[in-house]
Amino acid sequence: MKITKERLLQIVNEEIATFSAKKLNEATRSTIAIEDKNGKVRGTYIHSDGYLDGVGEVLAKHYKDKKKIEKLLDLGKAGISALYKSIDGGDDHSFNSPEKGETIFYGRDRGEDNDMTSQFKDRDAFATGHSEEFAYMYSMKDKKWYS
């Protein structure tokens, strides 16, 4: 089968339109964690968009409340595929068909039961002990995110 120049151009333009229409997640791994008032740190794994303009920005804008951060970590015990502003889920939300703006959890949304959490004795141990490209820690004492 011979493809004409016009047909090849049409295929390329369709692919470009498809990429432009979708928000693609990049597998830049990160760890998010919370430091309690005693200095102990607990965290979990996030698979996608771990860079500052991804997970870092979402955390700074939408995760300022201690209870929401703790719920995020609790729901993320089996890991988090992609972090968005909401952690509520919903009847129509699933791993394969996520609702827009909903965080995608491996446990709640895909039924996995892995333990992707980590525990550290203090923030120094967290800083040197995680294995992902990016790490974010919320300090309950300081009431702010560190990266």
Task: Describe the predicted segments one by one.
Residues M1-E26:
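Protein-protein interaction and targeting regions used for scaffolding, dimerization, and localization
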Residues N25-T31, S48-D53:
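His-enriched metal-coordination microenvironments in redox/metal-binding proteins
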Residues R29-I34, Y136:
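Short beta-strand scaffold segments in enzyme catalytic cores
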Residues I34, G43, Y51, K68-I69:
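Catalytic phosphate/metal-binding cores of nucleic-acid and nucleotide-processing enzymes, i.e., regions
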Residues E35-K40, S139-D142:
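Short acidic-glycine loop/turn motifs at beta-strand connectors
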Residues G43-L59:
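Glycine-rich catalytic cores of cysteine/serine-nucleophile enzymes that process amide/ester linkages
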Residues H62-S147:
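Low-complexity intrinsically disordered segments
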